[in-house]
Amino acid sequence: AETAAAAVGDVDLSDKKVGISIYQFNDNFMTLYREELVRYLTEDLGFAAENVVVQDGKGDQAEQTNQIQNFITQQYDVLILNLVQASSAPDVTDMCHAAGIPVVYINREPDVAEEERWAAEGIAATYVGCDARQSGTYQGEEILETATKGDINGDGVVSSRANRRMLTLSTEPSSLLRLLPTRAWKLKSF
């Protein structure tokens, strides 16, 4: 957070418009993510709250694509997208690129070929997220470090309750940094 804020420096972002579309609001992790994202954009980077618009994709790619088209029509300065379907990234990227609007994909990574296309064609698009396999491995290591090693009832099997506890821990903002260490995050800039 400090690095991005430092990179922005003295630039006034208060009149810049940020369009955010989350694949679905009833996902607990993405609820915390979007709340923290809005807080970060407004409090740390200086975007005006009224210029940061977050919409619910409702688990429907057509609905989300319509939201993205509306953001483009309304000339938003940047879009931050958690796609319903990562496979829609090429079409969405092309729409944003044609409008001259940078796009940041979060949490659901477009495929490697698409990311390579951005670099090859000079497209202002990037992905910010974590390596899910590495995060899962790290969470498993955390369970193994507990006194019961996740076997709460002593039956020799990692209890589902331990898994729920890890999920709860992993979605609390204060524990995200511990459960998703810096080395797990990818940041590809444009």
PLM segments and residue spans:
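A residue-level marker of the well-folded mature domains of exported/periplasmic proteins
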Residues: A1-F190
